[in-house]
């Protein structure tokens, strides 16, 4: 069995001959890549637990083999969000948070779209811009009422 060599810290003079730089040269390249550090690790880990639950129940990466229907994952995400909205934080089947289920399901849906095996069974859509139009109407109502307090 090979013995590990003890860690030896470099002498303070080791890098003395090198020119001091404001930043590591690799920073210039690294900051131009997709930033992953802003994604909250605890939420990603919750999603990992939800994915594990799904893997054990349906098989790992089952959607990449069988594909998905958009409506099934949309409906599931809304059910989880509605359960949470109505006060149920934890999914009784998995024991994990409903929001983590919604995020994970939407991630699977998006992955299936990117993978090319998603059946897009959405209904025919309204004209583009209808959400913006409705938001503008809501804003106009608020302006007209002189009441800018949220209605709850």
Which positions does each model-derived feature cover?
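Intrinsically disordered, low-complexity regulatory regions
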Residues: 1-152
């Amino acid at each position: 069995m090979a013995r590990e060599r003890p860690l030896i810290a470099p002498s303070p003079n080791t890098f003395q001959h090198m020119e001091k730089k404001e930043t590591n040269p690799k920073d210039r390249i690294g900051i131009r890549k997709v930033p992953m550090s802003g994604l909250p690790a605890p939420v990603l880990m919750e999603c990992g637990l939800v994915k594990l639950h799904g893997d054990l129940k349906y098989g790992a990466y089952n959607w990449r083999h069988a594909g998905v229907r958009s409506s099934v994952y949309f409906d599931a995400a809304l059910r989880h969000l509605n359960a949470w909205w109505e006060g149920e934080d934890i999914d009784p089947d998995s024991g994990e948070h409903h929001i983590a289920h919604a995020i994970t399901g939407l991630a699977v849906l998006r992955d299936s779209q990117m993978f090319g095996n998603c059946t897009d069974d959405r209904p025919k859509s309204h004209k583009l811009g209808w959400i913006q139009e409705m938001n503008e109407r809501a804003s106009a109502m608020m302006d007209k009422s002189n009441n800018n307090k949220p209605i709850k």
